[in-house]
Curated annotation (Swiss-Prot):
Protein name in the entry: DENN domain-containing protein 11
Residues covered by the uDENN domain: 19-221
This protein's record includes keyword Transferase: no
Entry annotated with the keyword Iron: no
Gene coding for it: dennd11
Function: Probable guanine nucleotide exchange factor (GEF). May promote the exchange of GDP to GTP, converting inactive GDP-bound small GTPases into their active GTP-bound form.
One Gene Ontology molecular-function label: guanyl-nucleotide exchange factor activity
Region annotated Disordered, chain positions: 1-86
Length: 490
């Protein structure tokens, strides 16, 4: 039995009329269209030298001196900001004129592969068709059709395949066929070196998956799409694309330590994230800054959960040049399944989501596990970070207060120059900048001692956040003396 997708109300988008079904096939109830995705934002770049670490044997016993070796990490490049929608016709059903405009590599040559995945009652998930024909799509048949998707009518999925990122649209249509056991399930997706512009093709993929359900085997629109958008990337010599073009992914805008991420669709993504987790956002914020491995579990639909992955990444933005080059990149994996276990075993930091409950038992693969609104960790050293302190509640109060002021100005004054996404991203970026700016100034001062006054000025609790600060100093390689009085001592 197919159930209607239970997306949160704040994540319902513009309705897209379903394509007309063939007379012999019943029309599915596909619900609202999922016309949305991740907007563009820059990704991490090497920004300069980090703060040098040293420890002094002459420091008193009440001082925590933190030392950490430096390691260089780099990540995939990004793209320029997306432009506004423009009216007009387009060659591909579902692509706007804006989507087809060519203004440089960031606007063209994005698509590494186009594919159709189907569920076969005898063979399971399988690649039905793809371009180019020799591209390595091993595992994509499971990434683009999440486990448990047979219970919903439609979904969309962001995922990672090697150094590429994918977006697939899934649909489930009832059919009068014993061979297909009453349901036809397919996904149509694309791969790209960057995930920042994948959302542009969401509408096209939705229309194409409906087309494939009604007219299986008709790939002409997908072939034309690929020829128009195909990437020109270096070859590994065997006809397979194996490397991302670093020159093509060169910085276009100013970079931060972590991507300055901005979502423009769907409206309400950040609002839903805040309402869903409430004060626990402050717990997630600390884990994100500490570059922990965060895994989010949820049953399908998984598209909404991919946005939670995105929102978690937004918590770790820092715009101070040179800060964070010694820490692992906080990598969004988006949707993962059991086939990704070997890749996760070598990851130092990531945030991902899954529909497979078995991951909860694989404790060696994650540091933080989120099931619904339940945030937990099996690591004893991280247990104290699950407890909210007064500074956490004060920050959350300020965030909610700023949201209310923004909503009031939008409703009363008609001020639409800012939105909740901007507010959310800037709120945490400013908080992070304040912390690292203070730590940097103390580290290079004549007396590199971090006092309770410094900690309060950073918006942290001198007692409740002491363990968090110790971990932060170690991970980011900042050499300061942390001196905080013990409340139990006179």
């Amino acid at each position: 039995m197919v159930e209607q997708s239970d997306r949160a109300p704040l994540l319902d988008w513009e309705e897209i009329p379903p394509a007309e079904l063939a007379p012999s096939v019943p029309s599915p109830d596909t619900g609202d269209s999922l016309q949305s995705g991740l907007s563009s934002y820059p990704t991490e770049a090497t920004l300069g030298a980090d703060i040098t670490l040293n420890t002094s044997p002459t420091r008193p016993s009440s001082v925590a001196a933190v030392h950490s070796p430096h390691k260089q990490h780099s990540g995939p490049g990004g793209d320029a900001l997306a432009e506004e929608d423009e009216p007009g016709d387009c060659a591909f059903h579902g692509l706007s004129v804006r989507d087809r405009r060519i203004t440089g590599w960031e606007e063209k040559d994005q698509i590494v592969a186009v594919f159709v995945v189907t569920f076969d009652t005898r063979s399971g998930n399988m690649i039905e068709w793809c371009l180019p024909h020799d591209v390595n799509l091993e595992g994509v048949e499971f990434k683009s059709m999440a486990s448990g998707s047979h219970r919903i009518s439609s979904d969309f999925i962001y995922f990672r395949k090697g150094c590429y990122f994918g977006l697939a649209c899934f649909a489930n249509m009832p059919v009068e066929s014993e061979l297909e056991r009453g349901a036809r399930m397919k996904s149509v997706g694309i791969l790209s070196p960057s995930y920042t512009l994948l959302y542009r093709y969401m509408h096209f993929l939705e229309n194409q998956v409906r087309h494939q359900l009604q007219c299986p085997g008709q790939y002409s629109p997908l072939e034309a799409f690929y020829e128009d958008k195909k990437a020109v990337l270096p070859s590994g010599g065997n006809g397979l694309v194996t490397a991302c073009p670093t020159s093509a992914l060169a910085p276009i805008v100013n970079r931060c330590m972590h991507p300055e991420m901005k979502i423009t669709h769907p409206a309400g993504c950040m609002s839903q994230f805040i309402r869903f987790f409430g004060e626990q956002i402050m717990v997630l914020w600390k884990f994100a800054l500490l570059r922990k491995r965060i895994l989010i579990f949820s049953p399908p639909p998984v598209g909404v959960v991919c946005y939670r992955v995105y929102c978690c990444c937004c918590l770790a933005n820092v715009s101070i040049p040179g800060m964070g080059v010694s820490v692992p990149e906080f990598r969004p994996f988006f949707y993962i399944n059991v086939a990704d276990i070997p890749a996760l075993e070598t990851e130092l930091s990531y945030v991902a989501c899954t529909t497979e409950k078995i991951f909860e038992e694989k404790k060696e693969l994650y540091d933080v596990y989120i099931d619904n609104q339940n945030v937990k960790t099996h690591r004893e050293s991280l247990q104290p970070l699950l407890r909210l302190n007064s500074a956490d509640r004060e920050k959350y109060r300020k965030l909610c207060e700023q949201r209310q002021l923004l909503l009031y100005s939008q409703e009363v004054d008609g001020d639409c120059t800012s939105n909740e996404e901007d507010l959310f991203i800037l709120f945490f970026m400013e908080q992070n900048n304040r912390i690292f700016q203070t730590l940097s100034e103390v580290a290079v001062s004549a007396d590199p001692t971090l006092t309770a006054e410094h900690v309060r000025a950073m918006g942290l609790d001198p007692q409740g956040d002491r363990g968090f600060l110790v971990d932060l100093l170690e991970i980011y390689g900042i050499d300061v003396m942390l001196v905080i009085d013990n409340p139990c001592c006179p």
